[in-house]
Amino acid sequence: MNTLLRFPGGRDRALTLSYDDGVNSDIPLMEILDAHGIRATFNINTALFAPEGMPMPDSVNTTETRRLSKEETVAAYKDTPHEVAVHALTHPFLQEMPASLVTYEVMEDRKNIEAMFGTVCRGMAYPYGTFNDTVVSCLRDSGIVYSRTTVSTGRFDIPVDWLRMPATCHHNDPRLPELCDQFLADTPGRPARLFYLWGHSYEFAHNQNWHIIRDFAKKMGGNDKIWYATNIEVYDYVTAFRRLEYSADGRRIHNPTALYLWLSTGGDAVCIPSGATVEI
């Protein structure tokens, strides 16, 4: 008997985005996403803030961008639906560093983010997309539970190796319209799907192609069949789902987690409340 992951509300697909470097063009990007109910994770380097008081460029109508200052960063991301995550303190090539400095880069960035936003920061994206097994081990020891690579699969698979997490595609991928159509097509009775889009918002300014993300948000947003989530929300939900406990015949399922979890056995989705045991 199949027991298929379903996202909150019984949905069979989820969408998440990831954007790097903490630049001023993240602000109009968030405005576009917010208008369509889409959530993203923004990965920042807390040693690279711009000086306070610098003029704010118009990154929508010009190609000019810059990093946000510390005060601007808090004002931009705090009290929004979006997540702020680690991108390492100084945006280094982590795989070229000894383990002690990798740990320093990750932990200091994490501590700064937590102090700025009052959160427990557990997510990350690799600067330059580069890493090795030593880096992965340092992340695990530093309390990081997922880290996005720059690998684009062109698929909607649910992550398995969260510290080497790939994306579906970059927003400049020529396959983007086709992938959106594939994702929006109904596939009843099939495994859950995750669309993961990544990039840098300054690319929209530098290339003056803001229409790409506007069109994407208009097409993919506001859909009752899609769960819109940050990276950490996807991680927490999928990890909780994988902790479900099954009886020997698979028909009795216990949810030991704090989340309400949904699954399907081929028909309608079933919700298993936190701490509950259900018969299917």
Give the ranges of each region predicted by the language model:
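A short acidic, amphipathic alpha-helical/loop segment
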Residues: 28-32, 134-138, 212, 216
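Non-membrane alpha-helical structural segments and their capping/turn regions in soluble enzymes
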Residues: 99-104, 174-177, 207-210
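Active-site metal-binding loops of divalent metal-dependent hydrolases
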Residues: 19-22, 88, 201, 231
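Catalytic-core region of carbohydrate-active enzymes that cleave or remodel glycosidic bonds
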Residues: 137, 141-151, 171-192, 214-220
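C-terminal domain-boundary segment and adjacent tail
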Residues: 1-9, 35, 46, 114, ...
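Metal-dependent polysaccharide deacetylase catalytic core of the NodB/CE4 family, i.e.
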Residues: 34-145, 152-165, 169, 192-201
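Boundary/entry segment of secreted carbohydrate-active catalytic domains
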Residues: 1-25
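Hydrophobic "anchor" residues on beta-strands that sit immediately upstream
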Residues: 16-17, 83, 226
